[in-house]
Each structure stands twice: as C-alpha cells, then as structure tokens.
Amino acid sequence: GITLKKVSKFANSHYLALDILIAANTKPGIAKVKVGNETIDFPLQKRRVGNGSQFANGATSSDLIYLIMPDRFSNGDPSNDRIAGMRDQTLNRDTVFNRHGGDLKGIQNHLDYLYDLGVTAIWLNPVIINDMPERTEHGYAFTDHYKIDPRIGGEKAYKELIDAAH
C-alpha cells in the first residue's frame, strides 16, 4: 500500500507536498488522496525496471530547444503589463532596460510558429515573481519561489501554456 509520511505546506496555498512511501508490491491504479474537503485521483503507474539511464531519453542532437525570455517574446495579454502593488511599473519597448510586456499568453499564441520552426522543447527564462524596483524583465531577480509572476500571466497562464504545448 501507500503510507503518508509527511505533509508540507507552503506560503502559496496552491501547493502542498506529500512525502509518501509506496510499497514495492503496490499494484498500478488510482489512489484516492483526500486534501481538505477535496479528493484527488493520484495515478500509480507501473514501476519501471532498472536505473533511470536505461529509459530516460533526455535531449538529443535531434531536438531543437528554443530559449524564450517571456517579457521579450510576445504580448498576448496587455491587461497584465502593469500589476498594482508591484515595484517595477516600467513598460517601454524603446529601451532594453525596461519591461516590454511579453507574457505566457503571447508564447501560447505563437506555438504554431515554434512548431513550424521545428522546436521540440521550450526553455523559459525564470517565470517566478520578480518584485524588485527595476530590471525585472529577465526573470532572475526572483522574490518568491512559489508564485508565477502575474505580469506574465500568473499560475493560470502558466498551466494553460503547458497544457497547450503538450
């Protein structure tokens, strides 16, 4: 069976970590996990045999990995360009030192373009919150490791991009 060893809660209530122990003889199927008033179906897959190097493909020379700085790629949702309460309110496409307004929706809107280029994987600059007074366009001034920056769309847009890309 399955044994719950530890529950870890985070500042962002959208996340919860469960440390579980799955016995070697546990069969594949659906485990019901109760979280508060909600029950979540957790799929238990058939265990793979051997070490990871026997079945992990990773990136190969046949892959085309495309690095995207979301702020610079495409502005798919102008409503998130400036977020009240955030310190960096700059928005000026005429200088490299300010935010340009690109976001996750802009990337999602151009998945066909990336596909047509032959892209097999998208590598994003950091997308977590960068609430610093300036130079936050690159994503490396993160101030919260558990929240997606709302100026590029937040958690909802991040999930939508991932779902659309797969």
Segments predicted by a language model, with ranges:
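Immunoglobulin-like IPT/TIG beta-sandwich domains and homologous Ig-like subdomains
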Residues: 1-37
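N-terminal structural segment of carbohydrate-active enzymes
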Residues: 36, 40-166
